[in-house]
């Protein structure tokens, strides 16, 4: 059985006090869930959040540079994340691609560096409105180029249709399920059927407590990468219960 996940991508939200308060409230109301729960605060809060983090909450960075050290102003490397005991990271989010012009080649380098360092990586992929689903195959082919089969056990994929991120639009359960099934076909073509069936693939894109249950009942969706709806600890705990 594939591992289920519920990961909150906080983006550039919450000050340090709010981030710590979330964790303290989370600890007071343990979630009854079979899913791996995680949060991704901004980089500057990772160290302090990690100090109060319970064992049943995974801490992720929102990005990592593929260069271990050097003259790269404004970036945080994967080795520096590991120095502060952060061993999980989101790579390739559409906002990184859109606002920071990250190409598939850059994402491939980040993915390769983080996986080779032993990190758990949540790789984001998704199409814009009007793009054919075959775009996902092209993107996967590029971002996974040169990545050894043995490293894929550390890989989680998050399918986030770009037209659904922060828009209030959500893919129907049928569309999300069928698209993720097609992603598994692409993985089997790039690697093999076993990898395709073993890899956890999440859905993201305007997921909230009001629609998560219906999405979670589909065969192919293995969890969720949630943005705005993950900022409220009570809503986060409600969403976690879909995998009770």
Curated annotation (Swiss-Prot):
Cytoplasm keyword on record: yes
Top-level EC class as recorded in UniProt: isomerase
Protein name as catalogued: Triosephosphate isomerase
Pathway: Carbohydrate biosynthesis; gluconeogenesis; Carbohydrate degradation; glycolysis; D-glyceraldehyde 3-phosphate from glycerone phosphate: step 1/1
Subunit composition and interactions: Homodimer.
Main function: Involved in the gluconeogenesis. Catalyzes stereospecifically the conversion of dihydroxyacetone phosphate (DHAP) to D-glyceraldehyde-3-phosphate (G3P).
Cytoplasm is among the record's keywords: yes
Source organism, top-level taxon: Bacteria
Active site: 93, 160
Gene Ontology terms for molecular function: triose-phosphate isomerase activity
Reactions that this protein is recorded to catalyse: D-glyceraldehyde 3-phosphate = dihydroxyacetone phosphate
Binding residues annotated for substrate, in chain numbering: 9-11, 166, 206
UniProt-listed Gene3D superfamilies: Aldolase class I
One GO-annotated biological process of the protein: glyceraldehyde-3-phosphate biosynthetic process
Subcellular location: Cytoplasm
UniProt EC number: 5.3.1.1
Family: Belongs to the triosephosphate isomerase family.
GO cellular component terms, A-Z: cytosol
TM regions (residue ranges): none
Record's keyword terms, sorted: Cytoplasm, Gluconeogenesis, Glycolysis, Isomerase
Major subcellular location class: cytoplasm
């Amino acid at each position: 059985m594939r591992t289920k996940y519920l990961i909150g991508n906080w983006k550039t939200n919450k000050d340090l006090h709010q981030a710590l308060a979330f964790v303290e409230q989370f600890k007071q109301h343990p979630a009854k869930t079979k899913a791996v729960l995680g949060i991704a605060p901004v980089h500057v809060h990772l160290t302090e959040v990690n100090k109060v983090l319970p064992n049943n909450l995974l801490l992720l960075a929102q990005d990592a540079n593929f260069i271990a050290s050097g003259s790269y102003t404004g970036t945080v490397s994967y080795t520096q994340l590991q120095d502060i005991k952060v061993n999980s990271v989101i790579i390739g989010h559409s906002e990184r691609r859109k606002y920071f012009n990250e190409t598939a080649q850059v994402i491939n380098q980040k993915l390769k560096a983080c996986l080779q360092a032993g990190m758990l990586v949540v790789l984001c992929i998704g199409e814009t409105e009007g793009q054919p689903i075959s775009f996902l195959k092209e993107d996967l082919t590029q971002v996974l180029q040169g990545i050894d089969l043995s490293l894929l056990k550390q890989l989680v994929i998050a399918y986030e249709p770009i037209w659904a991120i922060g828009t209030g639009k959500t893919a129907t359960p049928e569309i999300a399920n069928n698209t993720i099934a097609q992603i598994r076909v692409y993985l089997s073509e790039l690697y093999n059927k076993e990898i395709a069936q073993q890899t956890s693939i999440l859905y993201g894109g305007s997921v909230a407590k009001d629609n998560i249950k219906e999405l979670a009942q589909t065969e192919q969706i293995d969890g969720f990468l949630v943005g705005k709806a993950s900022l409220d600890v009570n809503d986060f705990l409600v969403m976690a219960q879909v995998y009770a």
